[in-house]
């Protein structure tokens, strides 16, 4: 149950009557006429998707909360009383009137694991703080799991006489103990709403005796939670997320110093690792993913102008096998990974990003995995999974607009709470919103609202149109900035959302800080409409 008491009192005291004024102007009515306009209001808030029922469900929840405070309001459907403060509260609640659903579609979790994009982290134990404090900690692992990350990466090195530690090679910061990391993963991997499998990717430079010790530690920590491949059974397809609920999968990424041979499968150049490995260690590795090399790597770069045979074969390959992308070099700051949308449109399941990566890429990653209730698994579109009559899909050929998204930004609120100490010290901020689409090249677009000068609660009322050829691969981003004449514009919040999950109607869009932490009050009142 959402506690609205504090929010309601704050909005009563501070929020202007702009939204009620908007409805008055739109319908040419007065306060007494507002109840008669309620069916239109609910229609704006409702969605055609029966599973959401956002308008009525939120109305009933508001009714229960207000009645618990002895506030005189009847259910919205009764059409008896509708007071403007309640309408204000409903519209501006990011919990009661969200832009996307927070429900996991469990019925869609029965396909093979390779049919999903998986929320993946890189160097999961990095704090990103290499100036003050420890560079490595279990806290980033815990935070990542709480945010829905399902792939955790650990680098294992020998430590002392027969010990094993977690840290990158050629780095002499105080390392982490492997057992400490395993315990943190076990404790935070699963909740009632995040029960789908967690994959631990291990990169090791260990001799067979230490590999055997790692196997014992994994078995002792996780026990029956560890997924083991049945050596007597040849699987054509990997089990589904539903079948692997509350399971730990171990994936190994051997160091580059091991010898490798090149093989070609479906036209895709693969890396085959060879080297001395403990048999028990091999048995605990139940998950295998290849990484880009040769033409496969070229297909995922950003400078490809025309599709080649290798790009089609990448998509064909990822229909039933796993592909993981990561930075090309060790230096994460100097060489960021491929753009996430480039890899997603080729069907790559795991795009690894770290806290040291560009913030814009992190926003896209966070936006993609807000889909499906934030469970960390997003089903690929059908056109990435099945070959059509003309062969394997390729997203930049023969684009045809299939849907048009219209986005109207009415107003925003909350900056005086979340950003007062950083902006508007000498005067009120000059805020504007940047709206962009990330997806296949034909769909990508960036637009800005006008700058609203000297406003803590700006009103824009501007509409933007985005023709989309592949909406299932599109993400919409909102970035708010305080306009500056002589210095870079100051960041004032952002969010990224999967376009396919948007609920039509007037929605309260919550904003986040640069690292994806939710702002306490800042939001945009926005309308989404499909045509």
Swiss-Prot record:
Q: Which domain of life is it from?
A: Eukaryota
Q: List modified residues, type Phosphoserine.
A: 276
The protein's matches in InterPro entries, at most eight in alphabetical order, are given as: C2_dom, C2_domain_sf, PI-PLC_fam, PLC-like_Pdiesterase_TIM-brl, PLipase_C_PInositol-sp_X_dom, PLipase_C_Pinositol-sp_Y
BP terms from Gene Ontology: calcium ion homeostasis; heat acclimation; intracellular signal transduction; lipid catabolic process
User: What are the residue boundaries of the PI-PLC X-box domain, all occurrences included?
Assistant: 107-253
- What are the residue boundaries of the C2 domain, all occurrences included? 386-513
Q: Give the source lineage, highest ranks first.
A: Eukaryota, Viridiplantae, Streptophyta, Embryophyta, Tracheophyta
Keyword check for Hydrolase, yes or no.
Answer: yes
Described purpose of this protein according to its UniProt entry: The production of the second messenger molecules diacylglycerol (DAG) and inositol 1,4,5-trisphosphate (IP3) is mediated by activated phosphatidylinositol-specific phospholipase C enzymes.
Alphabetized Pfam families for the sequence: C2, PI-PLC-X, PI-PLC-Y
Gene Ontology CC: one annotated term: plasma membrane
Residues forming the PI-PLC Y-box domain are 265-385
What topology in the membrane does the UniProt record assign?
Answer: Peripheral membrane protein
How would you classify this enzyme at the top EC level? hydrolase
Q: Which reaction does it catalyse?
A: a 1,2-diacyl-sn-glycero-3-phospho-(1D-myo-inositol-4,5-bisphosphate) + H2O = 1D-myo-inositol 1,4,5-trisphosphate + a 1,2-diacyl-sn-glycerol + H(+)
Describe tissue expression: Expressed in leaves, roots, flowers and siliques.
Would the keyword RNA-binding turn up in this protein's UniProt record? Answer: no
Q: Note the CDD domains from the entry.
A: C2_PLC_like
Query: What name goes with this protein?
Result: Phosphoinositide phospholipase C 9
Q: Which gene encodes it?
A: PLC9
| Listed PROSITE patterns | C2 (PS50004), PIPLC_X_DOMAIN (PS50007), PIPLC_Y_DOMAIN (PS50008)
MF-aspect GO terms:
phosphatidylinositol-4,5-bisphosphate phospholipase C activity
Mind telling me which SUPFAM superfamilies this protein's record contains? Answer: C2 domain (Calcium/lipid-binding domain, CaLB), PLC-like phosphodiesterases
